[in-house]
Amino acid sequence: MGGLTLFAAQGCKAPKQVAEQAKHPNIIYVFPDQYRNQVMGFWNQEGFRDKVNFRGDPVHTPNIDTFARESMVLTSAQSNCPLSSPHRGMLLTGMYPNRSGVPLNCNSTRPISSLRDDAECIGDVFSKAGYDCAYFGKLHADFPTPNDPENPGQYVETQRPVWDAYTPKEQRHGFNYWYSYGTFDEHKNPHYWDTDGKRHDPKEWSPLHESGKVVSYLKNLSLIHI
């Protein structure tokens, strides 16, 4: 699971200054890893089923259904490479995999596949527009290097090839709040690196933990920018 949180907080400005600015919408983009379009229960419900030319699977997804009713649902958005790293490269840069720098799933045997440092990503664009930008969960768009914050000169894991990766601040493309990892599939035992590079091992089911972190982030930021 991964998510971009783009919060329209224009810094700590006086109320009059904030009121004079054009109102920007807050944006939360959630992308699971990975669902077929049909495995969302809301596609069989009123208000949704007549908007698409397929039938949803007979599944029960009450939380996703509620989220859909409170969100903007795109009925014809397609990924031309629905694979972990290439898709994230496209999402972040707006480029095809052969241009984003991420044509393959990233691991230590594939230096050819890593998000371009010179790419202007969605986080860069929103940050320049005054947004407070956060990234939560799986990134899997960087070539792993021996840059473990707690063990300089070492990779963040011992298995080979190395899949997991730590993303340093200079490679976060506008995301000023960070709670992420490269790729790690033990979702009952996840880990994350925060904005300052400290590792967290919460011992909690990853979707539940990440959702809680997102909610806390939004609540705290709302209080700061009242």
Where are these regions (language model features)?
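Formylglycine-dependent sulfatase
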Residues: M1-I224
